[in-house]
């Protein structure tokens, strides 16, 4: 049986980490693509040389030509400019939209059957544009945001309660930006709702509110600390979890940026929602009940994403 083929568009910090994780998990052979000559080749060789130590079998190929991604089963897109201190994800719009146009053309030509995961910011607008540029069906093109934002939320909660991250369930809806919606009401520790933990004296509502805000600011916190780039370990791990669920037909329930067709009152836009990811891509979109405040927050987040999509159309009218 032939190995799966995983193509990584962009060989920066996230791309290199993706390649390493794909190797460690033996998800398939990896192609690293980048416009910078030598970078994907060097990283691919370096990771390949770690395989005898870590005991995994996979082929790593570096390339500067889209032809190398031909026939890929999964394509993960990280290409574009990362955030720097003081920048919002939205500041990257004009630059990264042009990148998505080139990437979309490459995927359309060489990997039209692939499951595509976009990580490039501003995430929700970029995955929306990438789907249009590539022409791939919407259920095969998703954005990585909710898994990462939820992981941050889960980690902060585990620290607050001094429990294993494995026992914390939490997820985040909406756009991947300052208006994201961490849902405390649907978050639990070993099945115990956060509201009950407040009553039990494990934490306070004020502390939970601060954790929710820290989750929203999670990416900016790391950008501020690194000063020269943005997060890459957690984003890469999140995308690999999505790719693994697709490749192994695990049918994981994961929050991803998916195209909505009426769910949550939204049409033809990519927004973070809980989904089932299996061998057919997005196999189901889970529409949960939101209370009045949650719905207002979600609608605000959707409006923010809609504004970014309109800005994209202003730059590239063909997206309309």
Curated annotation (Swiss-Prot):
Binding residues for NAD(+): 10-15, 34, 96, 119-121
Source taxon at top rank: Bacteria
The enzyme's E.C. designation: 1.1.1.37
Entries under InterPro entries matching the protein: L-lactate/malate_DH (IPR001557), Lactate/malate_DH_C (IPR022383), Lactate/malate_DH_N (IPR001236), Lactate_DH/Glyco_Ohase_4_C (IPR015955), Malate_DH_type3 (IPR011275), NAD(P)-bd_dom_sf (IPR036291)
Active site: residue positions: 176 (proton acceptor)
Alphabetical keyword list: NAD, Oxidoreductase, Tricarboxylic acid cycle
UniProt entry tagged with the keyword tRNA-binding: no
Biological process terms in GO annotation: lactate metabolic process; tricarboxylic acid cycle
Residues that, per the record, bind substrate: 83, 89, 121, 152
GO molecular function: L-lactate dehydrogenase activity; L-malate dehydrogenase (NAD+) activity
Enzyme category, top tier: oxidoreductase
Catalytic activity: (S)-malate + NAD(+) = oxaloacetate + NADH + H(+)
Keyword NAD: yes
Family: Belongs to the LDH/MDH superfamily. MDH type 3 family.
Role, per record: Catalyzes the reversible oxidation of malate to oxaloacetate.
Name of the protein: Malate dehydrogenase
Gene: mdh
